[in-house]
């Protein structure tokens, strides 16, 4: 039993080191910002191909955020982290942020996904940026609302005036799960 615990500890430690190493590839602040922006643009293009009306929803919003996340789950728990950028549509100002996630439950594997948040109001966007936003739970439905004209189809409401699209390597994910996730400013990039 001690060998199993020791092995699990080493697997989790290795997984955390791998996640940390992926975020340290770029050397300078400008290179890191450029890498995040490049991933954000690729993610938006992937989203627009999967859900063309998302482009209109994002353009008409107060702003949006794009995060690239990597999660690892081993037996009874998992962890993940990521980074991204929030873009204010009025000012074009970019705020770089990080994400950490904790999961409980049985499982084993590595998951890569990207989240695109759409902020209907400036207040919702500023709250996300400044409050170290965090949430837990599961949302599983994209809906058509009267004020969005179907533009949010494939997205899930995760907070008041905040919608989220989640993309995997296979495309748009209709079932979105975020458990114990926290988003916060990346002081080293802002």
Regions found by a protein language model. Give the residues of each.
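Small-residue-enriched, tightly packed secondary-structure blocks
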Residues: 27-190
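Bacterial N-terminal signal peptides
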Residues: 10-21
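Bacterial N-terminal signal peptides that target proteins for export
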Residues: 2-12
């Amino acid at each position: 039993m001690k060998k199993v615990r020791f092995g699990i500890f080493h697997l989790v430690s290795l997984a955390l080191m791998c996640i940390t190493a992926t975020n340290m590839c770029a050397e300078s602040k400008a290179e890191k910002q450029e890498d995040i922006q490049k991933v954000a643009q690729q993610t938006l293009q992937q989203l627009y191909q999967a859900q063309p009306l998302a482009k209109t929803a994002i353009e008409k919003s107060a702003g949006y955020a794009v995060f690239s996340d990597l999660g690892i789950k081993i037996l009874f728990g998992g962890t993940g982290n990521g980074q991204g950028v929030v873009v204010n549509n009025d000012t074009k100002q970019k705020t770089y942020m990080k994400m950490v996630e904790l999961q409980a439950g049985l499982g084993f594997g590595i998951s890569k996904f990207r989240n695109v948040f759409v902020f209907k109001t400036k207040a919702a966007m500023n709250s996300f940026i400044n409050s170290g936003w965090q949430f837990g739970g599961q949302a599983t439905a994209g809906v058509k609302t009267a004020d969005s004209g179907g533009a949010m189809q494939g997205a899930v409401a995760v907070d008041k005036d905040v919608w989220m699209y989640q993309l995997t390597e296979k495309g748009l994910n209709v079932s979105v799960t975020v458990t114990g996730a926290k988003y916060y400013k990346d002081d080293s990039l802002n």
